[in-house]
Amino acid sequence: MNTYTLYFDGCSKGNPGRAGAGAVIYDSAMIEIWSSAEFVGTNSTNNEAEYTGLLIGLRKAVEMGITHLLVRGDSQLIVRQMNKEYKVKSASLKPMYLEAVELSKLIDQITYQHVYREYNKRADELSNLGLV
């Protein structure tokens, strides 16, 4: 059993404003095997950008056939929503959350973990690249 790790992040300049998202997947030896930086939009919130980062990472993990995944992000809100500790109240986040839940069901073992920003540097770098 190989456990892969997905780090995700999002950023918004203005909140709402111009936003980018990033995600990176590491193999069980913590070697980067995939990464993505995406432009989210010109009127997006930070939380929408964070969910976008999560979704692009989850979609890729499913596409790669990953069965054991540790998901780490520095957004306490999103991690707690995915762990069902917080309800999703925002109408704009609800469809993103529901898609993330459905994608998570396609992975045999998935764990969501909050990490501090300093442990999420690569995904943060990618989310800022998504702004360009």
Regions found by a protein language model. Give the residues of each.
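RNase H-like nuclease fold core
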Residues: 1-48, 59-63, 67
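RNase H catalytic domain
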Residues: 11-15, 55-127, 131
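Residues at secondary-structure transition points
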Residues: 43-48, 52, 88-91
